[in-house]
UniProtKB/Swiss-Prot annotation:
Functional description taken from the UniProt entry: One of the primary rRNA binding proteins, it binds directly to 16S rRNA central domain where it helps coordinate assembly of the platform of the 30S subunit.
Gene Ontology MF term list: rRNA binding; structural constituent of ribosome
Name assigned to this protein: Small ribosomal subunit protein uS8
InterPro entries: Ribosomal_uS8, Ribosomal_uS8_CS, Ribosomal_uS8_sf
Family classification: Belongs to the universal ribosomal protein uS8 family.
Leader sequence segment: none
Keywords on record: Ribonucleoprotein, Ribosomal protein, RNA-binding, rRNA-binding
Gene3D superfamilies assigned: 3.30.1370.30, 3.30.1490.10
Species of origin: Chromobacterium violaceum (strain ATCC 12472 / DSM 30191 / JCM 1249 / CCUG 213 / NBRC 12614 / NCIMB 9131 / NCTC 9757 / MK)
Pfam families recorded: Ribosomal_S8 (PF00410)
Superkingdom field: Bacteria
HAMAP family: Ribosomal_uS8_B
């Protein structure tokens, strides 16, 4: 089976894993997925992540985070997708839940949150929103 949108697949695996109260989820690894996992870890949405498997087929393992038995991530959804890319300038980046959530962007300086992108004055492709 060919995968057309690996980022949507990653977000869906995280969402499904948390709905099923899984401790960790595994998926094929890529540089973009690792960068996205790093941002999620820095923002406190996941416990940790690790890269396992062989060099030719690395696997990304993400440890999910719960608080009082409930998933920390209430909402995680893809914004820009292969059929409709969404790009925002630094002044157009939306605030998620009035600043309680984060938007994750792919910029020329790497993958970062909406707050960091606004502070740096750069825009980019709006990958997903997390709350």
């Amino acid at each position: 089976m060919s995968m057309h949108d690996p980022i949507s697949d990653m977000l869906t695996r995280i969402r499904n894993g948390q709905h099923a109260s899984k401790v960790k989820v595994s998926m094929p690894s890529s540089k973009l997925k690792i960068a996205l996992a790093q941002v999620l870890k820095e923002e406190g949405y996941i416990e940790d992540f690790a890269i396992a498997g062989e060099e030719k087929k690395p696997v990304l393992d993400i440890q999910l985070k719960y608080y009082a038995g409930r998933p920390v991530i209430e909402r995680i959804e893809r914004v820009s997708r292969p059929g409709l890319r969404v790009y925002k300038g630094s002044t157009e980046i939306p605030k998620v839940m009035n600043g309680l959530g984060v938007a994750i962007l792919s910029t020329s300086k790497g993958v970062m949150t909406d707050r960091k992108a606004r502070a740096a004055g750069i825009g980019g492709e709006l990958l997903c929103v997390v709350a």
